[in-house]
A protein has these predicted regions:
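Secondary-structure junction motif
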Residues: 101-123, 155, 191-192
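A late-sequence structural motif
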Residues: 16, 168-196
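Short beta-strand-to-loop elements that line the ligand-binding cleft
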Residues: 32-39, 58-59, 125-136
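Short beta-strand-centered segments that line the small-molecule binding cleft or hinge
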Residues: 19-23, 40-76, 80, 140, ...
Length: 196
C-alpha cells in the first residue's frame, strides 16, 4: 500500500501515461499513484527534496545522487508541411535542418534542448526576423500547417496525428537522432520494489 509520487515531463506525459497506467494499477492495486507533469528542472528538485519517488524524463542527466534506468530511445521525426523546402525529400538528414525555419518548444523543455543540440552541430546562423517558441507540441504542428516552418516531433507524439498530418512526417535516414527516456529516482529511494 501507500502512495507513489511520479513526475513526468510534458513531452512524454500525453503519450506514455495511457500506455502504462492500466498495467501499474493492476500490478499495484493498493498503491495510490500520484502523477505530476513537471519540467526536468522541477523533477530534479523534487526528487532531491524527497517530494517525488521517481520520474520519467529525457536523459542522460548525469546528476550525482540520481539514478537513471533507460526505458527506451525515442526517434525524432521531421514534421514538414507541403510548402516547406524539404517537402519532397523522402528521408531527411541532420544536415538538412536549419534552425532559422524551425518551430521550437519554449525554453525549459528538454526536447527543445535536444533539437537545439542537433542544430548546433550545423553551426547555422540565427539571424531571421521571425522565431517562435511554443509550450506545446500540438501548437508546433498547427503552426507548421500554417506554413510558419517545420518542426521535429518525438516519435510517440506522431501516433496521434490525423491521417492528413501523417503525410507531413519525414523520418531521418539512419542513424536517426533520438532522445533517451529513463526512469529516474534518488539513489537512496526506499520504494525500489515499485521502481523495479
Amino acid at each position: 500500500g501507500g502512495e507513489f509520487k511520479l513526475g513526468i515531463i510534458p513531452t512524454i506525459m500525453p503519450t506514455l501515461l495511457p500506455m502504462f497506467l492500466k498495467t501499474f494499477i493492476k500490478k499495484y492495486p493498493k498503491v495510490k499513484l500520484k502523477i505530476e507533469e513537471l519540467t526536468t528542472e522541477e523533477i530534479i528538485q523534487r526528487i532531491n527534496d524527497g517530494h517525488l519517488d521517481a520520474a520519467i524524463a529525457a536523459t542522460p542527466l548525469k546528476i550525482e545522487n540520481i539514478k537513471e534506468r533507460v526505458l527506451f530511445y525515442e526517434p525524432f521525426v521531421g514534421y514538414i508541411p507541403a510548402n516547406h523546402r524539404l517537402k519532397n525529400k523522402k528521408t531527411i538528414e541532420v544536415s538538412d535542418l536549419d534552425i532559422n525555419d524551425m518551430l521550437l518548444l519554449e525554453d525549459g523543455h528538454c526536447f527543445r534542448d535536444g533539437v537545439l543540440n542537433l542544430c548546433k552541430t550545423l553551426n547555422k546562423a540565427d539571424d531571421e526576423s521571425f522565431q517562435l517558441e511554443s509550450g506545446s507540441i500540438e501548437m508546433l504542428v498547427k503552426l507548421a500547417n500554417e506554413g510558419m516552418g517545420m518542426t521535429l516531433l518525438p516519435y510517440l507524439n506522431t501516433l496521434d496525428l490525423k491521417e492528413k498530418e501523417q503525410h507531413n512526417l519525414h523520418f531521418f535516414a539512419p542513424p536517426s537522432p533520438a532522445r533517451e527516456v529513463s526512469l529516474i529516482y534518488n539513489k537512496n529511494e526506499l520504494k525500489i520494489q515499485i521502481i523495479n
